[in-house]
Amino acid sequence: MSKQDYYELLGVEKGASPDDIKKAYRKQAMQFHPDRNPGNADAEQKFKEINEAYDVLKDEQKRAAYDRFGHAAFEQGGPGGGGGGGFGGFGGGGFSDIFDEMFGEFMGGGGRRGQSTGRGADLRYNMDISLEDAFAGKTATVKVPSSAPCEDCKGTGGKDGAQPVTCSACHGHGKVRQQQGFFTIERTCPTCQGMGKIIKDPCRSCGGSGRTRKEKTLQVNIPAGVEDGTRIRLAGEGEAGMRGAPAGDLYIFLSIAAHRIFQRDGANIFCRVPIPMTTAALGGTIEVPTIDGSKAKVTIPEGTQTGNQFRLRSKGMSVLRSPARGDMFIQAVVETPVNLTKRQKELLNEFNEAGEGEKAKNSPESQGFFAKVKELWEDLKEG
């Protein structure tokens, strides 16, 4: 145990905040980490001392005991069983452990905690599908690069398939305890990395991890009626676990591409359909495409205006895990003719002249609008 003042070791004042202590420790740890100072015994010793200091000062109870009793608070009993790896913190691990400690809080927990079970990591795969695929469902083929159990050692990590043996440091528990004064600290065993077992003769193909990189081809069943952003879980299809531990899961995230004709709102579909001016005025029947590839007939009543909506029941999207379907809504867009011939213009003028006395009846919306404008001007004049 270092006899130097722990606050001096980290370069902070005695009243420093926990954040200041953490920042100072990270700076010192980066500077003196053995990976950055190979073969430098002084740097290695300094690294151990600042780990020892940080292990005490980062803990509220231990810091209070140190402030009251100094080093004497931790001289009873000394370190317990387990050995190796310093006094918590980054331990004797590689340089990447520092970044695990620094950024672990953003990943749902501290450092290398997830390695204690050896479970493989979960994977994410983003898949684009069409609206038609979302309606009908499909079976898609995906190729996912991931780790898989090593074929040479069958995932055990041992040469010629040799099985791991119980770790003598933690006796198979994956955790070791250290007694420091009044406190007992439990941490991941640095010898077996929390696995509880070690490989005496590692497999050359996988280096003892029991895993190799591999691209696997999977069939993904996409049910009819899925929504944009739907997540599909494939259990056990993620990264392989360490030395035979359970594999992680694969999550397929679906993104439905925008359609050229249809707009979706839940189980319903909307479609803007251009209606010829004559059909809108006289009425008639039109054919419209549907999401299932068929055509449906829609009756257009006389006097249809832009914005009028017509409903086709059960012509919308499939409903997830149900035989039902949503509805399709046709939104009329009355199309004004362009590029008219001389004869067409003559006919339209004749039509306009013929209806001169019927405008209030033929065009109620426009007549009502201009009547309101006239009233407005009269009110302004009177005011």
Swiss-Prot record:
InterPro entries linked: DnaJ (IPR012724), DnaJ_C (IPR002939), DnaJ_domain (IPR001623), DnaJ_domain_CS (IPR018253), HSP40/DnaJ_pept-bd (IPR008971), HSP_DnaJ_Cys-rich_dom (IPR001305), HSP_DnaJ_Cys-rich_dom_sf (IPR036410), J_dom_sf (IPR036869)
UniProt keyword list: Chaperone, Cytoplasm, DNA replication, Metal-binding, Repeat, Stress response, Zinc, Zinc-finger
J domain ranges (all copies): 5-70
Details of cofactor binding: Binds 2 Zn(2+) ions per monomer.
Mapped CXXCXGXG motif repeat ranges: 150-157, 167-174, 189-196, 203-210
Main location: cytoplasm
Superkingdom field: Bacteria
Protein name as it appears in the record: Chaperone protein DnaJ
Top-level taxonomy: Bacteria, Pseudomonadati, Pseudomonadota, Alphaproteobacteria, Rhodospirillales
